[in-house]
Amino acid sequence: MTANLPAAPMLYREFSTQAQIDAQYNPSIALADPAAPGKHFVAQSALARASLKQHLDIPFGATVHETLDIFPADAPNAPVFVFIHGGYWRALTSKEFSGVALGLQRRGITTVVVNYALCPWVTIDEITRQVRAAVAWTVRNIAQYGGDPARFSVGGHSAGGHLTAMCLQTDWARDYGLAPDPIKAALCISGIYDIAPLRYSYLQPMIQLDDGVVRRNSPAYTARACATPTWFTWGGAETSEFARQAQSMHAAWGALGNQSELRPIAGADHFTVLAGFERPEGELCAWLAGQLGV
């Protein structure tokens, strides 16, 4: 007779193995060609830099990685969108995401793409600090590039969605001497708002999570009262965990009386969800334009 073996302990929620967690959080696993999204982003970014006005590699901090790429709108005093790229905090740069400006520029919105240092050379705590500093610098200085700091928005994708949510937790008045809520709209795309499961994933050797990093950098558990209208979105074809992450953050945000929307991009995967920035009529461009009054 075969003895009944004890059930495997759970690493996170209903997941007992790294393979199960990786299947949820590694969006490249399901792709026929894992290199295709990167090639697309590079091509769109090259198009943006070849066709749009730009100010590249503007420093906002003391380190070589702390730079901004600014794509001004044609009209002066334009609303502003700061984009924070993904790459699970350990890959990619601002240069792969210049294409975000393609649709927004035609909507009359100035786009600022943030570059930051990466894990494992720095921690997620430090990346969060750098991104907050980038936002503060842009609020103070974007008027020099034709932007209107009174119509200022922030958004990001994947790790950038997480970092956008971390920006929304910031005490801007205390820490940066700004208005309490300088961000007038926020767009969190396919973000990770409870980073605990990634401690048990293929990413752990690079991002090096511990209890303190998880606690300090899981915005689903540190939400504050905030006046910024926010859209938590993800690709409708993404895994159940990406949907649950957005749902959990939306619930935490709403529990404090904050204003947010919860709605996926129909049919999109983790990468094609960004197509909404490539055309002015794209869903992401349209939402931002509505929030910023253009």
Task: Name these PLM-found stretches.
Residues 2-294:
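Alpha/beta-hydrolase superfamily serine-hydrolase fold, recognizing
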